[in-house]
Swiss-Prot record:
Chain's role: Catalyzes the reversible oxidation of malate to oxaloacetate.
Protein name per the record: Malate dehydrogenase
Similarity section: Belongs to the LDH/MDH superfamily. MDH type 3 family.
Superkingdom of the organism of origin: Bacteria
Known EC number: 1.1.1.37
Gene designation: mdh
InterPro entries to which the protein is assigned, alphabetical: L-lactate/malate_DH, Lactate/malate_DH_C, Lactate/malate_DH_N, Lactate_DH/Glyco_Ohase_4_C, Malate_DH_type3, NAD(P)-bd_dom_sf
Chain sites annotated for binding substrate: 83, 89, 121, 152
Active site, per annotation: 176 (proton acceptor)
Length: 321
């Protein structure tokens, strides 16, 4: 039985961490691609040399040619410029849009059957542009945002309640930006709704509201602390969870940026919603019921994404077709 092939486009902090996690989990053979000569080769060799210690047998290869991603089963895209202090995700739009055009062309030519996970920011607009440039079916290309944002939300809640993160269930809707919608109503601790925990005196509504706001600003908090880059451990772990769900046909319910076609009243936009990921990619979009407050917040988030997509069309009119 042939091993799966995983291509990682971008050999920066996230790309290197993705390669390490994929190797440790033995998800398949790994190609680390970057336009910077020597960088992917050096990281691939370094990781391969950790194999005898870690006990994994994955093949790792560094590459500067898209031809090396040929036949990939999964492609994870991190290529582009990361955020720096003072930058919004949206400031990256013009720079990273050009990167998505090049990456999409490479995928279209060499790996048109892959399941693609995009991490590049501004996420919802970049995965939309990547779908356009690659020509992949919408079910085979998603954005990694909700798993990460939900993980941050779960971590903050576990810290508040002083319980294991394993017992905290939470998810985040909407775009991957300051207008995201961390859902208190659909979040629980061991099945107990957060509203009940407020009544039990475990926390207050004000403290929960502060956690929601911290979740929205979670990426920026790390950017400001690092000063020279952005988060990479948690984003990489989140994308690997998505890749594993696809490769192992787990049918996991994960919040991802998926293309909507009428769900939540939205058409032809990539927005963060719960989806089922299995061997066919996005197998189902889960349309949860939103109350009036959540609908208003979700609509605001969708409009933010729509604004970015319209800006993409202005920068590159070819995407408007």
């Amino acid at each position: 039985m042939a091993r799966s092939k995983i291509a990682l486009i971008g050999a920066g902090q996230i790309g290197g961490t993705l390669a390490h996690l994929a190797a440790l989990k033995e998800l398949g053979d790994i190609v680390l691609f970057d336009i910077a000569e020597g960088t992917p080769q050096g990281k691939a060799l370094d990781l391969a040399e950790s194999g005898p210690v870690e006990g994994f047998n994955a093949s790792l290869k560094g590459a500067n040619s898209y031809a090396d991603i040929a036949g990939a089963d999964v492609i994870i895209v991190t290529a582009g410029v990361p955020r720096k202090p003072g930058m919004s995700r949206d400031d990256l739009l013009g720079i990273n849009l050009k990167v998505m055009d090049a990456v999409g062309g490479g995928i279209k030519q060499y790996a048109p059957d892959a399941f693609v996970i995009c991490i590049t920011n501004p996420l919802d607009a970049m995965v939309w542009a990547l779908q356009k440039s690659s020509g992949l079916a919408p079910a085979k290309i998603v954005g990694m945002a909700g798993v990460l944002d939900s993980a941050r939300f779960r971590y903050f809640l576990s810290e508040e309640f002083k319980v294991s993160v394993e017992d905290v269930t939470a998810f985040v809707l909407g775009g991957h930006g300051d207008d995201m919608v961390p859902s208190l109503r659909y979040s629980t601790v061991a099945g107990i709704p957060l509203t009940d925990l407020v009544k039990l005196g475990w926390t207050t509504q004000e403290r929960l509201d502060a956690i929601v706001e911290r979740t929205r600003k979670g990426g920026g908090e790390i950017v400001n602390l690092l000063k020279t880059g952005s988060a990479f451990y948690a984003p990489a772990a989140s994308a690997i969870a998505m890749a594993e769900a696809y490769l192992k046909d787990k049918r996991r319910v994960l919040p991802c940026a998926a293309q909507l076609s009428g769900q939540y009243g939205v058409d032809n936009l990539y927005v963060g919603v719960p989806v089922v990921i299995g061997a066919n990619g996005v197998e189902k979009i889960v349309e949860v019921t939103l109350d009036e407050s959540e609908k208003a917040m979700f609509a605001k988030s969708v409009e933010s994404v729509r604004g970015l997509v319209e800006a993409c069309k202005v920068i590159n009119p070819a995407l408007a077709g």
